[in-house]
Amino acid sequence: MDLKVFDGQEKSELSMIEVAHAILAYHNEAMAFADLTNEIQQYLGKSDEEIRERLSQFYTDLNVDGSFISLGDNTWGLRAWYPYESIDEATVGETEDEEDRPKKRRRKVNAFLAGTDDDDDVIDYDNDDPEDEDLDDDQGPDDDDDYEEDDYDEDNPVEDDDEETNIEDQLSELHGDEFGDDEEEDEEDKEDDEE
């Protein structure tokens, strides 16, 4: 294939995007990505390994470059071929058959209607948790959780008439000679006071 656009230029200096644009313009029709890549490889004379290394960058460049358009199914064309208004139609594809078929209307269901003929659609909120039934069955005459006088612990009675201790009493207990050095300080304080 001879692309006249690149006459006088070395093929090693050309980017894959430039060659892709020229190939699509030469064929004047959209091409599959694999076919486009194969033609680029043939034109540039690159090995399979060199193309594989640059393939992901080439695909990214196709997506980013504004002169290319994806037509679905990994088919690519030039954006200049499609007027602005027809881009959506070209990329969406043929869906006329689906639009002609009448759509099924969905029936609205009201879960709070009582006395309807179709009881399958009505939700019974009183009986919605099977675990509740299991708990009710487990309850027996011995499973009563209420407090009874038998639960009173005679070995450890709780007395209400304990000596009331206030915060001052507790602090004075803590303020005592915990470290054994308070007596020396107290004597020094007395000597200072006498002088």
Curated annotation (Swiss-Prot):
PROSITE patterns: HTH_HARE
GO terms for biological process, alphabetical: DNA-templated transcription; regulation of DNA-templated transcription
Keyword Repressor recorded: no
Span of domain HTH HARE-type: 14-81
Protein family: Belongs to the RpoE family.
Stored HAMAP family: RNApol_bact_RpoE
Protein function: Participates in both the initiation and recycling phases of transcription. In the presence of the delta subunit, RNAP displays an increased specificity of transcription, a decreased affinity for nucleic acids, and an increased efficiency of RNA synthesis because of enhanced recycling.
Descriptive protein name: Probable DNA-directed RNA polymerase subunit delta
Taxonomic classification: Bacteria, Bacillati, Bacillota, Bacilli, Lactobacillales
